[in-house]
């Protein structure tokens, strides 16, 4: 299956796993915003340190604005394959189309690693 239109670069599986782990740790020891509405507000206000966007969102219009908004606000973002797993990592019983890490807590090093890797991936993809 091809990637949705809002996915601008390919994220390797190991990096996606780190993103799930970062969300989980930030939820336990820092602060996160769950869901597209809260994530959008956090990005618009410049509070997000990292935005995690699920690739299996249907309809894609739900999260289509996030990569552009993140670029505009200079906030890094990464994709993960599953909204269900993203919801679990965020500590909710339903799927989450996106999550914003506001305060990484114990995930600070992990978030930094993800941001650096995303910079490399985006440079390779030319976005």
Swiss-Prot record:
Keywords: Cytoplasm, Ribonucleoprotein, Ribosomal protein, RNA-binding, rRNA-binding, tRNA processing. GO terms for molecular function: ribonuclease P activity; rRNA binding; structural constituent of ribosome. The keyword Ribonucleoprotein applies. GO terms for biological process: ribosome biogenesis; translation; tRNA 5'-leader removal. It is found in: Cytoplasm. One of its GO terms (cellular component) is ribosome. The keyword RNA-binding applies. It comes from the Archaea. Part of the 50S ribosomal subunit. Probably part of the RNase P complex. Multifunctional RNA-binding protein that recognizes the K-turn motif in ribosomal RNA, the RNA component of RNase P, box H/ACA, box C/D and box C'/D' sRNAs. Belongs to the eukaryotic ribosomal protein eL8 family. This is Large ribosomal subunit protein eL8. The gene is rpl7ae.
């Amino acid at each position: 299956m091809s990637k949705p239109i809002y996915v601008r670069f390919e994220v390797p599986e190991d990096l996606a796993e780190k993103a799930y782990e970062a969300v989980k740790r930030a939820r336990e020891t820092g602060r996160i915003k769950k869901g597209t509405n809260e994530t959008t507000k956090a990005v618009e206000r410049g509070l997000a340190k990292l935005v995690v966007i699920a690739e299996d969102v249907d309809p894609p219009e739900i999260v289509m604005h996030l990569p552009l908004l993140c670029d505009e606000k200079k906030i890094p973002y990464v994709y993960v394959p599953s909204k269900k797993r993203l919801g679990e990592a965020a500590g909710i019983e339903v799927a989450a189309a996106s999550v914003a890490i506001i305060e990484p807590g114990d995930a600070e090093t992990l978030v930094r690693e993800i941001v650096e890797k995303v910079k490399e991936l985006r440079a390779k993809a030319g976005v």
